[in-house]
């Protein structure tokens, strides 16, 4: 089964409707679109108490949108719950809730996934972590975005805005159940998910074709992962988060 997974908050429901509409109109259709939401508040999310009316309207076009109420873990709801509730070979795609995805976005991601025999995670947008002459990581804003089909085993950060394809078997079971991210990295889900894959020895490949189908919606609403798009004044926070997440996984595996 192929599912596309998203999460959102009350202040962004209208944006999410546009995103889901773009996914329903893909050239290759998923079997399900899962919207993972919560009614209790967490961080900047005040909770969603009623299923938005647009879910029923969009299901009239294609009845594949499913709403799941889960514990509010912020941005992690969209993929952690999908992984936990999936079968071993289900194909899981996660996406952001403030993006219009061009018609071939999913087609390109899945095509590359199949080209790699479903053994490599595929992400539209990957930042390449680079070091300076002192062998220290440069600031997040200086990490270049991969613009060709490159495979990565380490020193990469998947940015969720572009979408990513993976499966449950790509992540070690012992890592899936670890919710330390709620303390170590509550907002930087992109970093945590990237390190989950790296610690599981799963390669990730960038998809420039899918990246060209990603159209971010400009808005002033609260972001679910604000640190991922911070200005240069917050680069220190991002590097600190990367270091904390990496140390967590290194210590876990005795490295």
Question: Model regions: which residues?
Answer:
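Short, acidic, metal-binding catalytic loop of nucleotide-sugar glycosyltransferases
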Residues: 19-31, 39-43
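A conserved hydrophobic helix/loop-capping motif in glycosyltransferases and polysaccharide synthases
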Residues: 3-11, 26
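Short beta-strand-to-loop acidic/aromatic patch adjacent to the donor-nucleotide binding site
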Residues: 89-98
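Residues at the starts of beta-strands that form the adenosine-phosphate
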Residues: 1, 31-32, 91, 203
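Active-site-proximal specificity loops/subdomain of glycosyltransferases
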Residues: 38-90
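C-terminal catalytic/acceptor-binding lobe
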Residues: 1, 15-19, 180-255
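Short internal beta-strands
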Residues: 34-38, 123
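Conserved catalytic core of nucleotide-sugar-dependent glycosyltransferases
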Residues: 82, 102-178
């Amino acid at each position: 089964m192929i599912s596309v997974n998203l999460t959102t908050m009350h202040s962004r429901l209208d944006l999410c409707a546009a995103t889901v509409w773009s996914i329903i109109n893909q050239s290759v259709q998923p079997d399900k679109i899962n919207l993972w939401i919560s009614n209790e508040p967490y961080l900047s999310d005040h909770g969603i108490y009623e299923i938005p009316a647009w879910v029923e309207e969009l299901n009239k076009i294609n009845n594949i949108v499913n709403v799941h109420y889960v514990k509010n873990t912020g941005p992690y709801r969209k993929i952690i719950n999908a992984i936990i509730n999936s079968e071993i070979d289900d194909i899981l795609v996660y996406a952001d809730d403030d993006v219009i995805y061009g018609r071939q976005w999913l087609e390109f991601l899945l095509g590359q996934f199949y080209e790699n025999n479903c053994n490599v995670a595929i992400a539209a947008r990957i930042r390449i972590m680079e070091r300076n002459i002192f062998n220290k990581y440069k600031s997040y804003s200086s990490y270049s975005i991969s613009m060709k089909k490159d495979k990565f085993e380490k020193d990469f950060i998947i940015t969720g805005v572009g979408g990513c394809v993976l499966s449950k078997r790509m992540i070690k079971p012992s890592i899936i159940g670890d919710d330390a991210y709620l303390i170590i990295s509550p907002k930087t889900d992109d970093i945590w998910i990237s390190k989950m894959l790296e610690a599981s020895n799963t390669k990730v490949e960038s998809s420039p074709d899918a990246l060209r189908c990603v159209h971010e919606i400009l808005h002033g609403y609260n972001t679910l992962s604000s640190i991922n798009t911070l200005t240069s004044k917050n680069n220190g926070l991002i590097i600190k988060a990367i270091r904390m997440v990496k140390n967590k996984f290194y210590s876990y595996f005795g490295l």
